[in-house]
Amino acid sequence: MVSGMSTDEEKEGTSDEEVNEEKEVEETSEDEFPKLSIQDIELLMRNTEIWDNLLNGKITLEEAKKLFEDNYKEYEKRDSRRKAKKAVSKKVKKTKKKEKSVEG
């Protein structure tokens, strides 16, 4: 106890630091993952069902492969639409920024 703090105070300081570190870890982990749409969640559920059926022997490997490919094709269609929408919205935002900078 050279620092002048009692052992209880030292323990509280340590636990407060640990809580702060845990909060920082939680915040960064939430930022790392993209937001999932309902369609994305449904796709994940379908893929999980395919794996479940495959592992339980209800479908063959070839059937599972075909189902995964079908799901992926459907996902690609949705993803390409999303990218197109983002590209259009970015162009609009850039135009607005340019107009503001010209006026200002």
Curated annotation (Swiss-Prot):
Its EC number is 2.7.7.6. Residues 7-31 have a biased composition (Acidic residues). InterPro entries: RNA_pol_Rpo13. Disulfide bonds: none annotated. Residues 1-33, 78-104 are annotated as: Disordered. One of its GO terms (molecular function) is DNA binding. GO terms for cellular component: cytoplasm; DNA-directed RNA polymerase complex. Keywords: Cytoplasm, DNA-binding, DNA-directed RNA polymerase, Nucleotidyltransferase, Transcription, Transferase. It catalyses: RNA(n) + a ribonucleoside 5'-triphosphate = RNA(n+1) + diphosphate. It is an enzyme of class 2 (transferase). Residues 80-104 have a biased composition (Basic residues). It comes from the Archaea. Its main location: cytoplasm. It is found in: Cytoplasm. Part of the 13-subunit RNA polymerase complex. Belongs to the archaeal Rpo13 RNA polymerase subunit family. DNA-dependent RNA polymerase (RNAP) catalyzes the transcription of DNA into RNA using the four ribonucleoside triphosphates as substrates. Probably binds dsDNA. This is DNA-directed RNA polymerase subunit Rpo13. It comes from Saccharolobus solfataricus (strain ATCC 35092 / DSM 1617 / JCM 11322 / P2) (Sulfolobus solfataricus). The lineage of its organism: Archaea, Thermoproteota, Thermoprotei, Sulfolobales, Sulfolobaceae. The gene is rpo13.
